[in-house]
Amino acid sequence: MQFGPVPLDQAEGAILAHSVPLPNGRLRKGCRIGPEEIATLRGIGLSDVIVARLGPQDVHEDAAARTIAEALVAGQTAGLDLRPVGTGRVNIHVAEAGVVGVDAARVNALNAVDPMVTLATVPRWQRLAAGEMAATVKVIAYGVASASVAAAALAGQGALTLHPPRLRTAALIQTVTPEDDGGSGHRAIESRLQALQVALQ
């Protein structure tokens, strides 16, 4: 990937590296520079701009993040949702309550592939309610080598799984004493089960 200042007449098709303040807002970093953006930049008196330009073996940050995120949930037919990609980031949320399985060895292997590719997850067996986030894939640069994308996807394949509860009701057996009627323990267990959409009978 090439990175640095270029004259405006050479900037078309490149990626804007830094946000540029405008009288009525700003031109956001990461946007693809076209004729309209060049005209806007000229209009505020700029003659050059700092850009990133992907090489033939580079993958755009959004496409790279999506490819890696899809590999993470490979084999998981339901339960893990990939949210829309943006600025090189894909958040992975759970579609239903459950506990998240995380293969730490695969996560560590993925994070060792390229410093421009990162994965963060909740702890293994974290209990999550429907809609909560389980992991984030982030490509830090505007683009990353296709070889790194392929290696990261392979390293992290199937690293995330969701395990929803198999039962929808549960019974609690408690030992109580005259000093403790078990109410606080009952409420604590009930709250944890409710987070998994399991009713305590």
Model-derived regions: residue spans:
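Short, low-complexity N-terminal leaders and the immediately following helix N-cap/first helix
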Residues: 1-87
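Residues in flexible loops and secondary-structure boundaries
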Residues: 23-24, 35, 59, 100, ...
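Structured core elements
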Residues: 50, 91-93, 171
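Extended, charged alpha/beta regions that create polyanion-binding interfaces
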Residues: 55-167
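Phosphate-binding glycine-rich loops and their immediate beta-loop-alpha structural context
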Residues: 140-201
